[in-house]
Amino acid sequence: MAKHVAVLMGGLSAEREVSLCSGAACAEALRGEGFEVTEVDVDRQIGERLAALRPDVAFNALHGRFGEDGIIQGVLEMLAIPYTHSGVLASALAMRKDRARDVLAAAGVPIAKGVTVDRLEAAQRHILPPPYVIKPLGEGSSFGVFIVREDQAYPPQELTRSDWAFGNRVLVESYIGGRELTCAVIGEKAHDVIEIKAVGGGWYDYDAKYRKGGSIHILPAELKRNIYQNVQLLSLKAHKALGCRGVSRTDFRYDDRPEGTGELIVLEVNTQPGMTETSLLPEIAAYAGLSFGELVRWMVDDASCDR
């Protein structure tokens, strides 16, 4: 009898639309692998709905708040439904950028200089010498992110808007020039490294991430062998330091510009990497010889409680 997999998707976060795309792609692939699949658009009644549905496995295709921060993981633990990806603690730590920085720094993972402040304070003065980056503490997909350039006299005033939806605390980090890199961990192995270039020379924002043709992916990244291996080593080190399970994807900046510092810096660890047709994790898996169907099947087989 085929396993019944509930694909959790949509949800209540700013990343809802991305999650719907991830969930639809995963559901289609799981059906192709012979699973019985129910697509579940997550709302505040999700506990009651899952208790009634009683799937064998919950495939977590959620992104952002309530799906990536330990909350849905806690619900699934209470219901004793095995689930994919990381557990409660790792999800909560990775989602909170300030807490993740503390854990990574303690593990010897290189991170950018940064400080956490109130968003209104960040709008009043330059917290760090420009260039720097302002990020909400608990959002993904580049929502609410600003790059403050050296020629900007004032910080972004969007931070003062009454309809600001990304929390009152923000992380201010030094901007690291150079190349954008990412590496996926699947199970206990760090796979190949991608260099990401936004089309038009801009930064890797929401449009570059999710619009088809919005970015160029160079796989494998053209790096010196020691740098390439260090990216893989640090990806696995970050994955383990946070206690991640299943899959994760770690983003880096590598400043190899002629005038640069040579730094290789971890930006963040994603415990719920995108699973859309333009997403990086499926691309890395495919390069390793793992089809999208094989990837989602492996994730279902890896599912458990107490993660």
Swiss-Prot record:
Q: Which organism is it from?
A: Beijerinckia indica subsp. indica (strain ATCC 9039 / DSM 1715 / NCIMB 8712)
PROSITE patterns annotated for this entry? ATP_GRASP, DALA_DALA_LIGASE_1, DALA_DALA_LIGASE_2
Q: List localization entries.
A: Cytoplasm
Q: Any idea which positions bind Mg(2+) 2? A: 268, 270
> Which Gene Ontology molecular function entries are recorded, alphabetically?
ATP binding; D-alanine-D-alanine ligase activity; metal ion binding
Associated pathway = Cell wall biogenesis; peptidoglycan biosynthesis
Database matches in PANTHER family: D-ALANINE--D-ALANINE LIGASE, D-ALANINE--D-ALANINE LIGASE B
Q: Which GO terms describe its biological process?
A: cell wall organization; peptidoglycan biosynthetic process; regulation of cell shape
Per UniProt, ATP binds at 128-182
Similarity section: Belongs to the D-alanine--D-alanine ligase family.
Give the EC number(s) under which this enzyme is classified: 6.3.2.4
Which reaction is the catalytic activity of this chain? 2 D-alanine + ATP = D-alanyl-D-alanine + ADP + phosphate + H(+)
Physiological role: Cell wall formation.
What is the protein name stated in its UniProt record?
A: D-alanine--D-alanine ligase
Residues engaged in binding Mg(2+) 1 = 251, 268
Per UniProt, the keywords (alphabetical) are: ATP-binding, Cell shape, Cell wall biogenesis/degradation, Cytoplasm, Ligase, Magnesium, Manganese, Metal-binding, Nucleotide-binding, Peptidoglycan synthesis
Entry's InterPro entries? ATP-grasp (IPR011761), ATP_grasp_subdomain_1 (IPR013815), D-Ala_lig_Van_CS (IPR000291), D_ala_D_ala (IPR005905), Dala_Dala_lig_C (IPR011095), Dala_Dala_lig_N (IPR011127), PreATP-grasp_dom_sf (IPR016185)
Check the record and name the Pfam families matching this protein: Dala_Dala_lig_C, Dala_Dala_lig_N
Q: Which cofactor does it need?
A: Mg(2+); Mn(2+)
The residue ranges of the ATP-grasp domain are 101-301
Q: Name one GO cellular component term.
A: cytoplasm
| Cofactor stoichiometry and binding remark | Binds 2 magnesium or manganese ions per subunit.
